[in-house]
Amino acid sequence: RRGKPLEERSIGNTNLMDEHRKKKLLKNYRPGKLPTDLSRPYFELSKGQDAVTQMETCDLNLWMVGDILLKADKMSMANSLELRVPFLDRKVFELASHIPTKCKVNANQTKIAMRGAAEKTIPAKTADKKKLGFPVPVRAWLRDEQYAGVVRKAFNTPAAEQFFRTKELNAMLDQHISGKRDNWRQIWC
């Protein structure tokens, strides 16, 4: 990704499939807007800022609102849980938005200011722990024939055949199972 504009590099972190792969998998693929078409206005909004700030602006306006917060809200409601997002409290957000990038992240560490503050009240080992979110072992499940069999069955239904080139879907699953390619994210989506 080196040498590409920031907008393309940033999208590359989350883009699951390039246009070529979409054409291979989908029978009637019609390209719509590219991810960079959606993110460009937010990079323009923060033009002149450092790369981290530009990516944060894009994430705040696209990914958080349209993806991660939406999913968290739906999943918590579906399970009768009340979810709190303390870092989105207005006062906390306003304070955090004034923290210089050099106090947020460097080549070796993320969340520098937050970890520094946390180390004053919790063990350093905990404050320095890697962020995990809620990892689900989908990669491993898709290499287990019991679960891969369920996916393969879905890949070979009349509904799947209507929209997808199922031979390509099955090849993608086979590559993942054999370890030739790590396709779990593309299969899962």
Task: Walk through the language-model features, giving the residues of each.
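Adenosyl-5′-phosphate
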Residues: R1-C189
